[in-house]
Amino acid sequence: MNPLILFLAGGYSFWVGLMLISALLIPTSQRPSSLILKSLALFAGLILIAVSMTPIAIWWYAGLLVASIYWLIAYRTKQPLAERQSLARRGIAVCLLSALVLEWPYAVLPKVPVPEHRTLVILADSLTAGLEENDFTWPERLAERVDSPIEDLSHVGAVVKDGLTMIENVDLDGKLVLIELGGNDLLGSTPADEFHRNLNELLQRLTAADCAVVMFELPLPPFRYDIAYAQRSLCNRYDVSLIPKQYLLRAIAGEGKTVDSLHLSEQGHVQLADFMESFLQPAFSR
């Protein structure tokens, strides 16, 4: 996978942007060269954060923009006041700290919910199903390692709406459901409101069946805040454990892990099976 795509889709640009903006907190002289460097760091940081479209609260983006403008005013006036500069730095610091509080929980691996019945149901697209009939997929590899039934309902080309079809006539009561859907919605033309509606209905049905639900967070291209926000808000509403997108990207990124930059090779299936075995172990080891 292209390193730039990985950097953006994995949300790494958000954290690098925060690091660049944190340079504004370092007290420096009023020399023009120092102010120019800090201004460049500010603009670069804002651009990286903007293209990441991290689904953090809108008020945070607004607050960061206001704090950044105030910093520029406080430091670019001919006779800057120490009080203004101090207030500008405090405003930037509040934005950075609140970003850590709001976003860090989505960057760490959640605890897997323990289902009533030790059965894993997988709703997924071709990333899981594979492109060829003879592909030895990660669910098949996982099934050989754990002493629990695995029902792999994945199929090529599936979108979130297809998840509703997958679970028809399937006994879901009290089972653990893993969702790896949405990538084809992003690559296709599914509007954000339709994505929200379909995912809402899918999660509603799963929680009504008393399922424990886990979902892969979608690695997003720039400027898809709407899809990212819809996924996070619905997962919060239905108490769905969201696996940070970095973990899925680790199975995709790297030489030899995919056959076409999107679909897993044998090596990619092995790595994802290794991760899922470790992650799901608490649900299977009662």
Predicted regions and their residues:
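Short, charged beta->alpha transition segments
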Residues: 72, 108-110, 201-202
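Cytosolic-side transmembrane helix boundary signature
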Residues: 61-95
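Alpha-helical cap/lid subdomain in secreted, periplasmic
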Residues: 5-53, 62, 84-90, 144-145, ...
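Hydrophobic core of alpha-helical transmembrane segments in multi-pass integral membrane proteins
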Residues: 20-22, 46-48, 64-73, 95-103
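N-terminal accessory regions of nucleic-acid-interacting proteins
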Residues: 54-56, 78-79
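Short N-terminal helix-initiation segments at or just after the protein's N-terminus
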Residues: 59-66, 122, 159
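Serine-esterase "nucleophile elbow" of acetyl-processing enzymes
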Residues: 100-158, 162, 166-173
